[in-house]
């Protein structure tokens, strides 16, 4: 069960088609596994369609959407429906079946990375897969810009809590952390960065000029 979700504004931007392709992929992967957020987006899609038909020039504040979504969240859960037949996910189409067999490049300590930015031509963000070995620690770092991350496999923990598979995380310049992979398997994440991270450890910070 996912515990960390995109905020209302991000879901609104996704529903409106305003997110970049890499950010939209992160949302789509989360929605595939999160009925709660999927229901919210379905509602936003329906509201958007009505607004386009009846009042295309009327702007609606985020607080109104939050109020509507809160009402939906408070309603009793609907009866479960039969699961749809298995289909190839957006992730499988992009990277194949086995994430562990990708051509990972060892970076620092327990961290391996794979830059897949070239799969999103015309986009300004850096799109990176990161693998943290089971029980391993990532170097302490902060961010020079915004970083959107979704957990694809395993889990990691930092001072903000534990982030499990399909959890959605957004960090910025004010956030500094040192993730640790928890559980028995490697933790693999997909991150979209507007700028490189900034290492903050006593010795690792010397490597910052070489990070691109």
Predicted regions and their residues:
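Positively biased amphipathic helices and basic secretion/translocation or surface-docking motifs
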Residues: 1-9, 22-23, 32-35, 46-100
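Short Cys/His-rich Zn2+-coordinating modules
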Residues: 12-22
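Short beta-strand His + acidic residue motifs that chelate non-heme Fe in jelly-roll/DSBH
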Residues: 41, 138-141, 159, 177-183
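Conserved short histidine dyad/triad with adjacent acidic residue
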Residues: 113-119, 123-143, 172-176, 210
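Glycine- and acidic-residue-biased ligand/ion/polar-headgroup-sensing regions
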Residues: 133-136, 142-158
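Short acidic-glycine-tyrosine-enriched beta hairpin
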Residues: 158-178
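Ligand-binding loop in jelly-roll beta-barrel domains
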Residues: 175-199
């Amino acid at each position: 069960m996912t515990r960390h979700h995109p905020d209302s504004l991000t879901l609104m931007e996704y529903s409106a088609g305003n997110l970049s392709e890499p950010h939209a992929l992160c949302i789509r992967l989360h929605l595939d596994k999160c009925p709660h957020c999927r229901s919210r987006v379905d509602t936003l899609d329906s509201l958007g369609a009505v607004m386009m038909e009846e009042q295309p020039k009327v702007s609606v504040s985020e607080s109104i959407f939050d109020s509507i979504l809160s009402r939906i969240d408070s309603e009793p859960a609907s009866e479960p429906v039969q699961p749809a037949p298995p289909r190839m996910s957006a992730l499988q189409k992009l990277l194949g079946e086995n994430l562990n067999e990708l051509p990972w490049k060892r970076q620092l300590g327990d961290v391996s990375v794979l830059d897949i930015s070239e799969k999103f031509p015309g986009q300004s963000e850096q799109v990176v897969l990161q693998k943290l070995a089971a029980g391993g620690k990532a170097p302490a770092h902060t961010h020079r810009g915004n970083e959107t991350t979704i957990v694809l496999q395993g889990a990691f923990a930092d001072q903000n809590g534990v982030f499990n598979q399909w959890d959605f995380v957004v960090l910025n310049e004010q956030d500094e952390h040192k993730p640790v992979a928890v559980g028995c398997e490697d933790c693999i994440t997909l991150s979209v960065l507007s700028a490189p991270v900034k290492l903050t450890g006593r010795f690792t910070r010397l490597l910052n000029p070489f990070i691109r």
